[in-house]
Regions:
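Noncatalytic, solvent-exposed loop/strand surfaces
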Residues: 1-199
Length: 199
C-alpha cells in the first residue's frame, strides 16, 4: 500500500499569492475546488453578479465543456470537446484580465464517444502549476502542456487499460502534488486510481 501526500499543493499556492487592487489577492486556482478546500485567498469578493454588475468579461469557447477553469498567474485554462462524437479535444488559454484568447490546442480523440444529454463532455477539470497545465478527457486522453500550449507529453489510458464503460462518461477531476498527478477512473469496468509523474 502506498499513501499519497497531496498536501504540498496548499503551500505552493500560498507562496504564489500576491496582493491585487482593492486589497484583494490574486490567487492561483490550481484545480477543482482550488487548493482542495473550495476557499480563495482573495478578499472582498462579490456575493453576486449579473450581466450588469461584477462581471469583468465573458468569452465563448469552441465546443462544449463541463469542467471547472483553472488559473495560474494571468492565465485561465479550460477544456471542451467538439463534434458529434467528441472527435476533437480542446484546451483553451485566456488572459485573466480581459478574456483574450492566448491559444487553443486541439487534438484528435483516441476514442470517439457519441454525444447525448446523458454523457458528460470534458467534465474532468484540469490542474495547473508552475510547470504547466494537465488535462484528462472522458476518452482516456491524459496530456501535459506548457503554459504557452506546447505539448509536453500524452498518454491514452484507454489504450493502456481498456475502454471507459458506463452510461454517463467520466467525471473525476485530476488532483495534484508538487510532482505528481492523481487520476481516478471510476466506471463500470475495472476502476483504478493512478499516480502519474508530471514530467
Amino acid at each position: 500500500i502506498e499513501v499519497l501526500d497531496f498536501s504540498p499543493e496548499v503551500e505552493i499556492e500560498k507562496k504564489n499569492s500576491k496582493a491585487g487592487k482593492n486589497g484583494s489577492k490574486s490567487s492561483n486556482w490550481g484545480g477543482f475546488r482550488g487548493k482542495g478546500d473550495s476557499r480563495s485567498d482573495s478578499l472582498n469578493l462579490p456575493l453576486g453578479w449579473s450581466d450588469e454588475s461584477n462581471l469583468a468579461w465573458r468569452m465563448a469557447i469552441e465546443g462544449y465543456g463541463q469542467s471547472t477553469p483553472v488559473v495560474w498567474g494571468e492565465r485561465v485554462f479550460s477544456t471542451s470537446t467538439e463534434g458529434e462524437e467528441s472527435e476533437r479535444l480542446l484546451v483553451h488559454c485566456h488572459n485573466l484580465k480581459d478574456g483574450e484568447l492566448q491559444w487553443c490546442k486541439s487534438v484528435p480523440t483516441p476514442v470517439r464517444i457519441k454525444r447525448s444529454q446523458y454523457v458528460s463532455q470534458a467534465a474532468p477539470s484540469p490542474v495547473v502549476d508552475a510547470r504547466g497545465v494537465f488535462v484528462f478527457f472522458e476518452s482516456g486522453l491524459l496530456m501535459g502542456l506548457s503554459h504557452s500550449g506546447t505539448e509536453l507529453w500524452r498518454r491514452s489510458l484507454t489504450e493502456e487499460y481498456g475502454p471507459m464503460m458506463g452510461n454517463h462518461g467520466i467525471g473525476g477531476s485530476l488532483f495534484q502534488s508538487a510532482d505528481s498527478l492523481g487520476v481516478l477512473v471510476d466506471h463500470d469496468g475495472p476502476s483504478y486510481l493512478m499516480r502519474v509523474d508530471k514530467k
